[in-house]
Every structure is written in C-alpha cells, then in structure tokens.
From Swiss-Prot:
InterPro entries: Ribosomal_uS8, Ribosomal_uS8_CS, Ribosomal_uS8_sf. NCBIfam families: PRK00136.1. The gene is rpsH. This is Small ribosomal subunit protein uS8. GO terms for cellular component: ribonucleoprotein complex; ribosome. Signal peptide: none annotated. Pfam families: Ribosomal_S8. HAMAP family: Ribosomal_uS8_B. One of its GO terms (biological process) is translation. SUPFAM superfamilies: Ribosomal protein S8 (SSF56047).
Length: 132
C-alpha cells in the first residue's frame, strides 16, 4: 500500500502511542523523519530516538517522554502543511504556537528548524507541524 503522507503517519503514531502510554513507538525511517525526531528531542518533547537498520528502509524507534510517568509531554501534535495543501510562510509571518509554549517545525533551506530559530535566522519555509 502506498502511503501518501509519511510525516502525518509519524505524527499520528507518536500521538497514539502517547495516549496509550507506550514507552516507545516504531516508525518506518526516512531522512526527513530522523530530522523531525532530532528537532523533537532538542525541544524536549521526546526522550530519545534511534535508527534500527533492517534489510529494507530501516526503523525509527522513538522513546516518548512522560510527566510523572502518567501524562505524555506532547499535549497536541498537529500536521499543518499537507500534500493537498502546502502552507508556506515568510520569516515575518511566522506565528507563535500557544503564545510561545509550543513550537512550529518548519522545513527551510537550512533544514528542519523551529519557528523561533527561523525567526532569528530570518528565513521562512513550509510549516510541517505544530507541537505543544
């Protein structure tokens, strides 16, 4: 079966695993997903991740983070730019997520960065998702 939006699949797997209180979730790996996991780890939304090599494309294992081992750190993770409707913003049009409590992850010419980093660097890009 062909997957039309692998990023949305990754975000959905992370959201569902958090609600089910799983400690880890396995996702088919790609360079974009590894970059996305790197940003999520740097912002403190996940504990860690690792890429497990297999004979195919590899598996990205994401270790989730919880507050007091009960509530997931990620309250909401939402896909913004979709294959049927891309959302691009300039550096001066990037909005804060939940008044700065959350982050928007952008795909820019400098790679995947958060909304704050994109504003500081003065670059815009495609808004992949928001997390808070």
């Amino acid at each position: 079966m062909c997957m039309t939006d692998p990023v949305a699949d990754m975000l959905t797997r992370i959201r569902n695993a958090g609600m089910a209180k799983h400690q880890k979730v396995d996702i088919p790996s790609s360079n974009l997903k590894v970059s996305l996991a790197t940003v999520l780890r740097a912002e403190g939304f996940i504990k860690n991740f690792k890429v497990i090599a297999d004979n195919k494309q590899g598996i990205l294992r994401v270790y989730l983070k919880f507050i007091d081992e009960k509530e997931p750190v990620i309250n909401e993770i939402k896909r913004i730019s979709k294959p049927g409707g891309r959302v691009y913003v300039n550096s001066d049009k990037i909005k804060q997520v939940k008044n700065g409590l959350g982050v928007a992850i952008l795909s820019t010419s400098k790679g995947l960065v958060t909304d704050k980093t994109a504003r500081e660097m003065g670059i815009g890009g495609e808004v992949l998702c928001t997390v808070w």
